[in-house]
Swiss-Prot record:
Pfam families with a match to the protein in the record: HTH_WhiA, LAGLIDADG_WhiA, WhiA_N
Protein name as annotated: Probable cell division protein WhiA
GO biological-process terms attached to the record: cell division; regulation of sporulation
GO molecular function, one term: DNA binding
Family listed: Belongs to the WhiA family.
Length: 316
């Protein structure tokens, strides 16, 4: 079972008060429901590929409105051929749609009615219902961090985004081919969202994976940094040795001033040690890393002049 499916199964087991149940059911029916006419009466069909979500719709509708509901199972004929679960509501359909602010004055409402989310707990419940109906979240173990909720209507998606940002989640709205999404890309904000909608077990798993991933990434960055520094050090040492050998071939190392001559010989003899270690080997006393670097730069300048055929004056 995917991380998103496990999370949704957890969310469907949350106990809620009547006002919160209404808010959650409103999101579920608005986003997963459709209205048909059968035998001269309205019928609401709420469809999901997740059996736990279908049971949630059934139990919330029964709890709030006390009506009988048909549960149907269909087999998808395309792609994975998953089961499709349908909650069919034939009784009190107009009352239900009116009560959940999906239908007002005979017109379908595309935005989120504020009467549903007056209380803080109801806002969280509406977001939970919206995620159950149209939400997805990447597996934190294998993918980049991403959580989204799909809406058919722009005004509804913007309402979700605004509600999420009421909790400081930095959510964004984006148009997709067949609708709109409200999405989060930051791991910390996804964790906050899971907490807001009551997905505490999913939150713990997400945080565990996130900690391991962040630690692994930190180690990789450190290794890469150390490797880059090592390669830089090796490259500099090879260049220095090459320049010293050029000087030796052209004019002889013995022609260098004493302070450069000793460093040149030490570098050729100890090509794999650091500048700090070179400075500790000088016979006249320890010199600093910057002091060693200054002398090696002087040697580099002399070698470059020799390559260019320039005149060199060496002070003993």
């Amino acid at each position: 079972m995917s991380f998103a499916s496990e999370m949704k199964n957890e969310l469907t087991r949350i106990e809620t008060d009547l006002c919160c149940s209404k808010a959650e059911l409103a999101a579920l029916i608005r986003m997963n429901g459709n209205l048909n006419i059968q035998n001269m009466q309205w019928v609401i069909n709420v469809q999901s590929e997740n059996a736990a979500i279908a049971r949630r719709v059934y139990s919330l509708t029964k709890k709030i409105f006390g009506v009988d509901i048909e549960l149907l199972v269909r087999k998808k004929m395309k792609l994975k051929k998953n089961n499709v679960y349908i909650c069919r509501i034939k009784m009190k359909t107009k009352e239900i749609l009116d009560e959940l602010s999906i239908l007002q004055d005979g017109q379908f409402v595309q935005h989120i009615d504020q009467s549903l989310i007056k209380e803080e707990c109801c806002k969280r419940s509406y977001l939970r219902g919206a995620f159950l109906a149209g939400g997805s979240v990447n597996n934190p173990e294998t993918s980049s961090y991403h959580l989204e909720i799909f809406s058919l209507y722009e005004s509804h998606s913007e309402g979700l985004t605004e509600m999420m940002n009421g909790y400081g989640l930095n959510a964004k709205t984006l148009e997709r081919k067949k609708g709109y999404i409200s999405y989060l890309k930051e791991a910390e904000k996804i964790s906050d969202f899971l907490s807001i909608i009551g997905g505490y077990q999913a939150l713990l798993k997400f945080e565990d994976v996130r900690i391991v991933r962040d630690m692994r990434n930190s180690v990789n960055r450190l290794v890469n940094c150390e490797t880059a520094n090592l390669n830089k050090t090796i490259g500099a040492a090879m260049r220095q040795v090459e320049n010293i050998r050029l000087i030796d071939e052209e004019i002889g190392i013995d022609e260098l001033p004493e302070r450069l001559r000793e460093i040149a010989r030490l570098r050729v003899q100890h090509q794999d040690i650091s500048l700090k270690e070179l400075g500790e080997m000088v016979s006249t006393g320890v010199i600093s890393k910057s002091g060693v670097n200054h002398r090696l730069r002087k040697i580099d300048e002399i070698a470059e002049k020799l390559r260019n055929g320039e005149h060199i004056e060496l002070k003993k």
